[in-house]
Amino acid sequence: MEDRIEKIVQTLDNNKADEIEVFDLREKNYFVDYAIIASSLGSKHTFALLDHLRDDLKPQEKFINVEESGDWIVVDLGDILIHIMTPEYRTKYDMETFLSSLANGREGDTI
């Protein structure tokens, strides 16, 4: 699992994603083991990062579902969820606060 996370982070980093964060949710009441959030430089870069992930992770990874928009892409690998967001969407939706509360065992806290 750690190798998979490292490969995802490396792919995002090598392709100029910003503020990459990994949340370990294995012991929490969440539907995936890990969540990864990364910022893109803009809409075109968001799609480019998705293309790089597809190129670098296939055929090892099965992309169960991909929700695409220029501002926010969610990649579901089954046990890992990857969020690629423009800085504006990342600020607006503040997924870090939600995922940090889960990772720190505060599942019931309101955000």
Task: State each model region's role.
Residues 1-38, 42-57, 61-62, 104-111:
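Ribosome large-subunit tunnel/peptidyl-transferase-proximal elements
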Residues 61-72:
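Short, conserved loop-to-beta-strand elements that form functional interface hotspots
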Residues 37, 72-74:
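Conserved hydrophobic/aromatic beta-strand scaffold that supports enzyme active sites
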Residues 74-102:
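C-terminal structural segments of small proteins and small subunits
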Residues 29-31, 68-70, 77:
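Short Gly/Ser/Thr- and Asp/Glu-enriched loop/turn motifs at secondary-structure junctions
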